[in-house]
A protein has these predicted regions:
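Beta-propeller-forming repeat regions
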Residues: 1-230
Length: 230
């Protein structure tokens, strides 16, 4: 998710970028990117999506276990009878160029949630959010002066449960406040410090004005909305 806000207080528009975070098997960098491959690799009319990552040896390996891969692509079961035979296969070993023809490949070089800072001259730079914001995917962001000290604060929430069993649930975000200190600096305040505590899968966050109060409304996947008063 993306939220525009003047993060550093210099009068131009910056952005808060919610991303997948760093608490997962996907550790993408410019030197070792991660890829999403989308295509009909066995030419049966069904489209498959495969995530792969570059590892320390410089090769690109699929981030999919053999059982899951062969359910989508039965040819894998025939080609690699044993799990140990599949274990060390790179993406190029598994799929020939002919099988990859017509597929779409997209690359990412970071999964960090970040600030995108505008220098006012048409240039932008990424600054990673504090490590506490990297524990789980960020799906909801709001910016405002929530503690009424005249400085911009940022609320973050998210999580994602619908992952494969071997990946586990991404549920380590209970609600986070980045308390503004001015000039783009923020202090991390956990839910136990602020009372802004939310469980489940937040998918959006909205500010609602009511009288003299501001309410933060959290929309959740397969759950009722949650409301906080500031």
């Amino acid at each position: 998710c993306i939220k525009p806000a003047d993060i550093d207080g210099d009068g131009d528009m910056d952005f808060v970028l919610g991303n997948f975070g760093l608490n997962s098997k996907i550790q993408a960098t410019a030197e070792k990117p991660a890829y999403l491959h989308v295509g009909d690799f066995d030419k049966n009319g069904a489209v498959e999506q495969i995530i792969s990552c570059v590892t320390e040896d410089g090769n690109t390996y699929p981030m999919v276990l053999k059982g899951e891969m062969q359910r989508a692509l039965p040819m894998i079961k025939k080609k690699f009878i044993k799990y140990k035979d599949y274990a060390n296969q790179t993406f190029d070993d598994l799929f020939s160029q002919e099988q990859r023809d017509g597929s779409i490949e997209r690359q990412i070089t970071t999964t960090q949630s970040s600030f995108l800072i505008n220098d006012g001259k048409g240039n932008f730079s990424l600054q990673a959010l504090p490590y506490q914001a990297q524990f789980s995917p960020i799906k909801g962001i709001q910016a405002g002066d929530f503690n009424k000290d005249g400085k911009l604060d940022i609320l973050l929430a998210g999580n994602f449960f619908d992952s494969l069993p071997e990946w586990g649930r991404f549920d380590a975000n209970y609600g986070l406040l980045l308390e503004g200190q001015g000039k783009g600096k923020f202090a991390v305040k956990l839910s136990k410090q602020t009372g802004f505590k939310t469980l489940g899968q937040v998918r959006n966050m909205a500010l609602v004005k009511g009288g003299k109060s501001t309410y933060v409304v959290l929309a959740k996947n397969d759950d009722k909305a949650q409301v906080f008063k500031f």
